[in-house]
Design a protein with these regions (language model features):
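Conserved class I S-adenosyl-L-methionine
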Residues: 1-45, 59-60, 82, 86, ...
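Class I SAM-dependent methyltransferase SAM/SAH-binding core
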Residues: 49-103
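A short SAM/SAH-binding and catalytic strip from SAM-dependent methyltransferases
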Residues: 113-125
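Short glycine-dipeptide loop
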Residues: 47, 137-143
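A short acidic, Gly/Pro-enriched loop at the edge of an enzyme's catalytic core
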Residues: 102-114
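A short glycine-rich, Lys/Arg-flanked "PGG" loop and its adjoining helix->strand segment in the class I
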Residues: 127-139
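C-terminal alpha-helical "lid/dimerization" subdomain adjacent to the S-adenosyl-L-methionine
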Residues: 4-12, 27, 144-203
């Protein structure tokens, strides 16, 4: 096993995000503007089947229209509990369940829109996750990605290489390249724009 590989496993994700769940919203809300912008780009229609992978505490729910069907999934039951609690006020048409984003319990071509916010830099294998998304998406379906990636066209700095074991321990990998990930799938990149922290976070929209 590679050094620090344990920090990129579902087991470790369950441990740390169970611990973070009670206070996650304190920091999570700093990305509200980008979450909203990303979801608006999907153009969710009435009756759409919307899947959130890595829903966390449900911070995306308030930006999703009332008249669609939402399934929120997360690897930890503590996060799902927070999502359900939040929805008692938001009153979205919501089903929430514990699920691994690398193994989706959905039939082929059954989902209209997928939201992947701050998950591709955390999930052990982002390529497997996107391939699963591609499988369950209906033809023409879209994916909203908001996450931290190495900025397009830049090489890894020494500082990022040094910091990554620490960030990977605490919350996520900061050295993943979206271009490398997307090169292994057949989804079309419709848009890719810089977002928070000087473009280290990006808002990306994919289509099947």
């Amino acid at each position: 096993m590679k050094p620090f590989a344990i920090f990129s496993t579902n087991r470790w994700n369950r441990i740390r995000y169970t611990l973070y769940a009670p206070g996650y919203d304190i920091l999570g809300r700093i990305f509200s503007k980008s979450r909203s912008r990303s979801i608006q780009g999907l153009g969710i229609c009435p009756g759409d089947e919307v899947l959130i992978i890595g829903a966390g505490t449900g911070l995306d729910l308030e930006f999703i229209p009332m008249n669609c069907h939402i399934t929120a999934t997360d690897i930890t039951s503590a996060m799902i509990a927070q999502t359900m609690r939040k929805n008692t006020l938001l009153k979205r048409n919501l089903k929430a369940e514990v699920m691994d984003g690398q193994h989706l319990n959905f039939p082929d071509s059954s989902v209209d829109k997928i939201i992947l916010h701050l998950i591709l830099a955390v999930i052990p294998d982002p390529v497997v996750c996107l391939k699963e998304c591609e499988r369950v998406l209906k033809p023409g379906g879209q994916i909203a990605v908001f996450d931290k990636f190495v900025p397009k066209g830049r090489t890894l700095s020494l500082l990022r290489k040094i910091l990554n074991p620490i960030t990977n321990l605490l919350f996520s990998n900061i050295n993943r390249s979206f271009e490398t990930i997307v090169s292994e799938i057949s989804l079309l990149t419709e848009s890719d724009v810089p977002a928070d922290f000087n473009g280290n976070f990006r808002i990306i929209r994919l289509r099947k």
